Amino acid sequence: MKNIRNFAIIAHIDHGKSTLADRLMEECKAVDPRKMKEQLLDSMKIERERGITIKSQTVMLKYTAKDNEDYVLNLIDTPGHVDFSYEVSRSLAACEGSLLIVDATQGLEAQTLANVYKAIDNDHAIIPVINKIDLDSAEPERVRAQIRDVIGISTENAVEVSAKLGTGIADLLESIVKYIPPPEGDVSERLQALLIDSWYDIYLGVVILVRVKNGSIKSGMTIEMMSNGNKYCVEKVGIFTPEKRNVTELRAGEIGFLTASIKNARDCNVGDTITDAKNPCTEHLPGFKQLRPVVFCSLFPVSSDEFEKLRQSLEKLHLNDSSFTFESESSSALGHGFRCGFLGMLHLEVITQRLDEEFDLALVLTAPSVVYRIHMKDSSVLELYNPTEMPDPSKIDHIEEPWIKASVMLPGDYIGEVINLCNEKRGEQIDLVYVDNKAILTYGLPLSEIVFDFYDKLKSVSKGYASLDWEIHGYRSSELVKLSIVINGEEVDALSVMIYRPNAEKRGREICERLKELIPRQQYKIAIQAAIGGKVIARETVNPYRKDVTAKLYGGDRTRRMKLLEKQKKGKKRMHSIGKVNIPQSAFMEALKVKP
């Protein structure tokens, strides 16, 4: 075990994490040069397109160091985005060290900081890796100073590399062997293994990625998931090189995979403890928690015929990603669809993009919302996932919404614009620290303000330089109301949103104006209203077509003309009372793009 090194790679998006993993594999000759391709560990099409890592990946590398000892290096390539921060924390718990990759041209970013602090909490040995030193704009000394001043760790063991050109990779491998400690554990103890991640394989069922802390896992033994008590018989155990390779057993300190004919990824919770069903360990490994979605959105197929196809597609995606939830719902305006829960906005985008590309589904999405807590006057507390389920306002005592603690890292030049943006979004400043030419701004913000366009606006006002990290920071009471959109006296449930009362009139007017442009004119007048309870706060009218019923008349008595106009008036009145306004799907999609 003394020659095993388990380490994770921590980096912000686009700082060269997956490229560095490619170079480490090349240096250790883990992959046939003919099969080598960029971002080898990012297996999903969407990961390669967006240049992001969504699922944790692992690879075992064999390395002969300068001391002529043979070492086994287990590398875990973790997601970098805030939505997947729990997966990162479990990947880090499986390791003893981390490579902190920082772009020599951009310096530290907010999400890098958040993940480094998680690594420090796990008592990791951290090796700073300053990447992209081949670029003319690289400033490695400034980045070293940032790492020392902001994170407070030594940069004496920092390694300067160019993942693109392969410069410094040999020195980095020597540093991994020298500075990262070997794993601790006892093969003779009862089995205790950490579930790092899981995914679905069409032939093997659910494949589980594990780090064995104590004991060993062999094929044929019966294992138990400690969070739910489910028992399974292990069929295969193996390692990734990065190809799957079966082995006879996984021993304490090692990272690998197992299969056990598990049919549902829902039974395999990231962070769970796996033990021997016949001789179980007595305690969980620390840090396990059930993942809960924080952003909710309804998905409806544009064609009602595709409802069953959407259900099957969501079930297939759920096999690989059990962190999103879905349940069927129906809307009077949009028909049958699903109410889905996600870990964040990137998670929502990834799932909807996969539905579009992999399953060829055209979807209508409702406005994203968060989970509100409604305290009733009878002291009961309800959780509101969908604005259409809002109870009678007269029975509500107060409403609470989730707040987050956001860290924004940006160049000092843009601090004024970003503070203005945070204040617009009802933010409360917690801290502001300047390091070198960068500022770290900490704000408390309502999550509902973040899920719309905050990230886009932040990038816009900072010319793309700001980076954001956030974590849920409890619930707070707030002045919230349900904004309803009423068309010709009928409420359109798909357009209902929960909103902060002082912003309701502006948002209501924006939606009404947008709908006025989008709804086609009918033979009768269409009233579009935004209302809170029974009170209308904004109104627009779509004027009717006017058919010239008197065109066929020439000369004669004016009473004939009056009679025809009166008949038209009565017809329009009857039409208005029985006519249903036909709102095209595109109108919903456009109206919901209105930003609060």
Curated annotation (Swiss-Prot):
Does Nucleotide-binding count among this protein's keywords?
yes
Keyword Nucleotidyltransferase appears in the UniProt entry = no
- Per the record, what are the reactions this protein catalyses? GTP + H2O = GDP + phosphate + H(+)
* Pfam families xref list: EFG_C (PF00679), EFG_III (PF14492), GTP_EFTU (PF00009), GTP_EFTU_D2 (PF03144), LepA_C (PF06421)
Record's PANTHER family?
A: TRANSLATION FACTOR GUF1 HOMOLOG, CHLOROPLASTIC (PTHR43512:SF4), TRANSLATION FACTOR GUF1-RELATED (PTHR43512)
What protein family is recorded? Belongs to the TRAFAC class translation factor GTPase superfamily. Classic translation factor GTPase family. LepA subfamily.
- The identity of this protein, by name, is Elongation factor 4
